[in-house]
């Protein structure tokens, strides 16, 4: 397979990034490919980059790795864009849950299906989604866009309506 560039937006999440890098390292057809880690939080980005680089070295994967806090730089020449970004972070979710609890909302047994999520979280996620898609259309219009960031269904519906 030809070498490809994979841009990971929101790469500061160790859970998502490490799982993804594990799969990339163990896929021989991606040998020689570039993985571009992008996150606005430099401290988290540096930590994830260091862990992923170490894993790639230990598995002898022939991946090229780079890191940046500049989304447009990460998107340059990308063949695949993976969005794992959560704008408000876990603390934002906690704040949203606390507001819901304060006003008597029940969460139906799952914090992933929250009554207040549409108001508290999705506004920020939609804004990030829209700006990311617009950058992709400008910078790497032929790239495949994979959304792993929640709310996946709501973002997919917005994709169908607006793009």
Identify the meaning behind each predicted range:
Residues 2-97, 110-163:
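Metallocofactor- and cofactor-centric catalytic cores in central/energy metabolism, strongly enriched
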Residues 16, 102-103:
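Short, glycine-/small- and polar/acidic-enriched structural segments
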């Amino acid at each position: 397979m030809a070498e490809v560039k994979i841009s990971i937006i929101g790469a500061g999440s160790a859970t998502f990034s490490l799982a993804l890098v594990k799969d990339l390292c163990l896929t021989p057809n991606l040998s020689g490919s570039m993985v571009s880690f992008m996150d606005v939080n430099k401290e988290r980005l540096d930590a994830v980059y260091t862990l992923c680089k170490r894993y790639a070295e230990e598995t002898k994967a022939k991946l090229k790795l780079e890191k940046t806090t500049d989304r447009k730089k990460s998107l340059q020449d990308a063949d695949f864009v993976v969005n794992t970004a959560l704008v408000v972070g876990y603390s934002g979710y906690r704040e949203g849950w606390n507001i819901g609890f304060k006003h008597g909302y029940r969460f139906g047994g799952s914090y992933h299906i929250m009554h207040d999520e549409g108001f508290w979280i999705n506004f920020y996620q939609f804004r990030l989604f829209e700006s990311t898609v617009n950058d992709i259309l400008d910078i790497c219009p032929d790239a495949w866009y994979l959304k792993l960031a929640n709310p996946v269904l709501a973002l997919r519906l917005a994709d169908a309506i607006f793009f």
